[in-house]
């Protein structure tokens, strides 16, 4: 399932995020606040906290803002969300001055007109490229939620914003939790060093129950109301990118990370087996062909109950790497790696990314290495989605040349 914060979750890990579990899971992580170089922060003095503007104040935005505050090196000073109730609830929780709470589709621009050192972007994915580009243009460091975009033009935009950020000596970090995990990192390093031999094929799955329960209720109340549709963005194909991009990207990202490649082409299918609201599908099946004729089968569903898992496996001539979002990460074969269990990955990964963002800003590191692989994984989901929608084989080059743009229905929403 997916909780209202966008957390990828299964029956095994529902309800795990609470204060006690979070503190226990992250107690080994400690940060010492370094002296902040004055030139890296605008309108602040050395040793002061990084001034954050939050764009997107829903459940996930509020949750991750709390992690930024707990880090100790940040202060939330401004907030923007389309909805007044959300930005006010957020502002009260984090003591954001009422004059620095902005609403409407263009509220983020007013936020950036003020003095913020960095922006955290947690709104519907359709808006991510626009918000990220505006942040970089305004001279702010950018912390961007996945997925980075819903379509090819959006991915190109974020890729360009990442390059522009580096040129302007700004940090730009994409918040994929899996890539921060020590077990995942060690397993991927071993595979790329040849521990399972030549990879022949693989599989990636995202099998969960139905999510977005609150959004379903919102949309069911009045499906034609534009503000209801915006609140229920996870059920809207253009606002979310559909489940293969918005949710399933967690599994796809691990596959592209292990193979360190983009697919050549893909064949797919899927549909709506249970959903009755919105226009997103609830299941996808895709066969990706990567360089060297490596075949990776992908399957996802967000419906029903029963067995569920978020995993990626790669099969080599000398072994198998097996990774699970909430379970075992290991290698079996001639050169085994016992690995272990990826613990509380959703929270711990975000905490590590928040720490990395702070350390990169304060140390003046602007390589922004998370952007290119995030673009690659996002485009890989779009390739699978395109192939599934058209029920045929689609090449990477064909997808990029088509440059298809998703356009949501924003009529009736306030600017």
PLM region spans:
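N-terminal secretory signal peptides and thylakoid transit peptides that target proteins
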Residues: 8-30
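Glycine- and charged-residue-rich phosphate/anionic-cofactor binding loop of Rossmann-like
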Residues: 74-76, 337-343, 360-376
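A structured beta-alpha segment of the ubiquitous adenosine-cofactor-binding alpha/beta core
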Residues: 99-117, 121
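N-terminal Rossmann-like dinucleotide-binding module
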Residues: 25, 29-94, 255
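Beta-strand-loop-alpha-helix segment that lines the small-molecule cofactor/substrate pocket
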Residues: 129-180, 194
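Predominantly a Rossmann-like dinucleotide-binding segment in NAD(P)-dependent oxidoreductases
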Residues: 56, 167-173, 178-278, 286-288, ...
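C-terminal capping/lid region of NAD(P)-dependent oxidoreductase domains
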Residues: 171, 197-203, 387-404, 409-415
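NAD(P)-dinucleotide binding in Rossmann-like oxidoreductases
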Residues: 276, 289-352
């Amino acid at each position: 399932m997916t909780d209202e914060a966008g957390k990828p979750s299964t029956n095994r890990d529902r309800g795990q995020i609470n204060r006690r579990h979070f503190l226990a899971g992250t107690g080994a992580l400690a940060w010492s606040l370094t002296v902040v170089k004055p030139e890296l922060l605008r309108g602040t003095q050395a040793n002061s906290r990084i001034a954050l503007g939050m764009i997107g104040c829903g459940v996930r935005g509020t949750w991750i803002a709390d992690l930024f505050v707990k880090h100790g090196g940040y202060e939330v000073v401004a907030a923007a969300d389309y909805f007044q109730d959300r930005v006010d609830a957020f502002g009260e929780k984090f003591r954001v001055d009422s004059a620095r709470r902005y609403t409407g589709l263009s509220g983020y621009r007013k936020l950036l007109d003020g003095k913020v050192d960095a922006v955290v972007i947690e709104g519907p994915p359709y808006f991510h490229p626009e918000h990220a580009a505006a942040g970089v243009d305004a001279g702010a460091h950018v912390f961007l939620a996945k997925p980075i975009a819903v379509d090819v033009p959006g991915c190109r935009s974020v890729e360009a914003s990442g390059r522009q950020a580096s040129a302007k000596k700004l940090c730009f970090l994409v918040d994929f939790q899996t890539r921060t995990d020590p077990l995942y990192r060690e397993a991927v390093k071993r595979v790329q060093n040849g521990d399972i031999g030549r990879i022949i094929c693989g599989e990636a799955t995202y099998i969960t129950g139905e999510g977005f329960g609150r959004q379903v209720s919102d949309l069911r109340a009045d499906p034609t109301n534009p503000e209801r549709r915006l609140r229920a963005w996870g059920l809207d194909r253009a606002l979310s990118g559909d489940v293969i991009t918005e949710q399933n990207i967690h599994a796809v990202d691990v596959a592209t990370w292990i193979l360190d490649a983009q697919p050549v082409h893909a064949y797919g299918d899927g549909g709506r087996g249970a959903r009755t609201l919105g226009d997103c599908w609830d299941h996808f099946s895709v066969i990706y062909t990567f360089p060297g004729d490596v075949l990776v089968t992908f399957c996802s569903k967000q419906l029903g109950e029963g067995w569920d898992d978020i995993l990626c496996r790669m099969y080599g001539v000398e072994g198998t790497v097996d990774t699970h979002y909430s379970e075992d990460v290991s290698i079996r074969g001639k050169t085994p790696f016992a690995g272990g269990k990826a613990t509380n990955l959703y929270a711990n990964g975000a905490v590590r990314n928040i720490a990395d963002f702070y350390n990169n800003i304060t140390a003046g590191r602007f390589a922004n290495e998370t952007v290119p692989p995030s673009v690659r994984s996002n485009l890989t989901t779009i390739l699978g989605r395109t192939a599934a929608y058209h029920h045929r084989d689609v090449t990477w080059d064909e997808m990029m040349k088509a440059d298809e743009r998703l356009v949501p229905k924003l009529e009736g929403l306030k600017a």
